[in-house]
Amino acid sequence: PYTLQTTWAAQPAVLLPWFRDHKPEVLEKTKWIMSMKDYIRFRLTGKVAGEITDASSGCLVNLDTRRYDRRIFEILGIEDCYSKMPKILESTDISGYVTKEAEKMTGLPEGTPVAAGYFDIDANALASGVLSDQELCLIAGTWSINEYLSKEAPREIEKKKNTVTL
């Protein structure tokens, strides 16, 4: 009820308990838990941060507070992971600036602002022009996703459907 979505096998809410049970040494050595996009942003800026649309898609965020929720980590038996989660930024926040080291590696000018960014599905909706609750978008790809905007998150999730609320 906190995350307002169902889980699937590649989410942190599923993967972290698996690591706890099968490869605890990996979690013991882990300093931060973040998405790939967050890691790339970290390498560009040197700043550790998460981003709300990626973070919420992992089933560890309480969407009412838009923050990681210790209760979710306790329910999943991964309490030790809670302190390894980075602060969550809004998608349009500037998370930092390209460092001198990143400039040498990428050719991006030092000091270039780096936005937190969007989860791919959210970015797709924006790129498709879904800007109000009067429009919807269909993604005919790996998942065949239908997406729309709503002022209110769905509170009743049908168990037969994979619902993601971001």
Model-predicted segments: where are they?
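Glycine-rich phosphate-binding/catalytic subdomain of phosphoryl-transfer
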Residues: 1-166
